[in-house]
Amino acid sequence: MLVSPDGLTKLLLKNGAGLALFILHFIFLAVEQDKFNYKDIYLRKIDINKRSIMGDLKHKQAFICDMDGVIYHGNHLLDGAGDFVNWLNSNNKNFLFLTNSSERTPRELSEKLKRLGVDVEESHFYTSALATADFLSLQKPGCSAYVIGEAGLMNALYNAGISMNNVDPDYVVMGETRNYSYEQIERAALLVQKGANLIGTNPDTTGPTEKGMVPATGSLISPIEMAAGVKAYFVGKPNPIMMRRAVRRLGCRSRHTVIIGDRMDTDIVAGIEAELDTVLVLSGVTSMDMVKKFAYRPKYIYSGLAEMLKTM
């Protein structure tokens, strides 16, 4: 027969029993008396964890956020995106939208968000096109390139002092494009065979749209790699070069910065390797089942920005 809590306390003090034994015995006593609810204890533990997560994210100084699959799908703003930007501004957080897409300029991205009802200045955007231009201008100032891509890439390279050259360029640079021809593939492959270095703005093989997944730079550059017999160098996420520049732009230390993304193979691994806290949202290309296939894990997982904001 179990003794009462008071009797047990006196007995333990008298005999010098350990604290662990006291706690264990007390739990067994409470269970017998139907006064101990394991479900309540479990729920309290979850609530404590949620408050801990809220504290971690709420007090970060800087936020790096992907766009496709996090902020929008095509021309559809995702739940919580506008509220998230409002929260960043009202709490004076440093933030940067870091996208592997090279199609649009920062101005075009700002205008797109404005059309969707979210006001963000151009200075808050850093694209793989800008990262590629920065990389090439540091590697070989005044270099030239044969470029396959859209306005975002062309403008970034031009503004970095890189000239266009389709005869004997230093680099062949490939980004996302919707105007892709066999003649471009052929010329690019021949130029690489003659000595031009092959650069890709990002390694993504697919990108999300309202219609579904479509080929991205990693897929588009593949025929050139195969024909020229070389592997491209990719500047965008998860390349540490792009991550270091992003953190430097924010002016914060890694431990005070968090990255939010929808791709395990770019956003999350980039954050882990840069020693940032990582948030995976399941509003883009990654499902919970897919997460299990990777050797690494994000620190936090949410269905989307709307759910994340509930903890902040």
List each language-model region with its residue ranges.
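Intrinsically disordered, low-complexity segments enriched in serine/proline and basic residues
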Residues: 2-9, 17-26
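Polybasic, lysine-rich low-complexity intrinsically disordered segments
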Residues: 14-15, 45-46
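Asp-based, Mg2+/Mn2+-dependent phosphohydrolase catalytic module
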Residues: 28, 49-65, 70-79, 83-93, ...
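Compositionally biased, low-complexity peptide segments typical
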Residues: 35-41
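Conserved phosphate/oxyanion-binding catalytic-loop motifs
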Residues: 101
